[in-house]
Amino acid sequence: NGEGENNYLIDWEKPLIGEAAQDLGHFLAPTTTYWKTDVLLTKEQKHDFVKQYQSCCKNTVEYEELQYRTDRYETMTCLRGVTWCAMAWVEYQDPNRPIQNQATYQKIQDYLTEDFLNWIWNSYFA
């Protein structure tokens, strides 16, 4: 909703009571935030989001533990996102592919650039 406004995390894909860190990791991962926008959150922005989320949990979870688990899920989400993009890129090479979306194809190509892949590597694995 923007700077100074309330923002909410709602899992529309599989609404169930589960691991909050998994939803947070998916929501904050660059392979999610950058998909339909040009937003790449800083580490500080992501940690601030987790702190705000944790403060709403009425102390049912310790911040350090939640941040640790969120970081692990975020890493795996990045791996899944990049490998999905590699698969989608191959699919888009077929000129008879029934669905072609130029914006999606461009974003897939963005994710597979050496700069983006190096950024993921340095952010999560170096």
Regions found by a protein language model. Give the residues of each.
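Active-site activation/catalytic loop segments of kinase-like enzymes and analogous catalytic loops
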Residues: A21-N59, T75-D94
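Amphipathic, non-membrane alpha-helical segments in soluble helical-bundle scaffolds
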Residues: I17, K43, Y68-R72
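Short, surface-exposed loop/turn segments at secondary-structure junctions
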Residues: T37-L40, E64-Q67, D94-Q100
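ATP/Mg2+ or Mg2+-diphosphate-binding catalytic cores
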Residues: G81-A126
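Active-site acidic catalytic loop and adjacent metal/ATP-binding pocket
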Residues: N1-Q22
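Glycine-rich, flexible loop segments associated with nucleotide phosphate handling
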Residues: E5-Y8, L40-D48, I99-Y111
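All-alpha amphipathic helical-bundle segments outside canonical DNA-binding/catalytic cores
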Residues: T60-T75
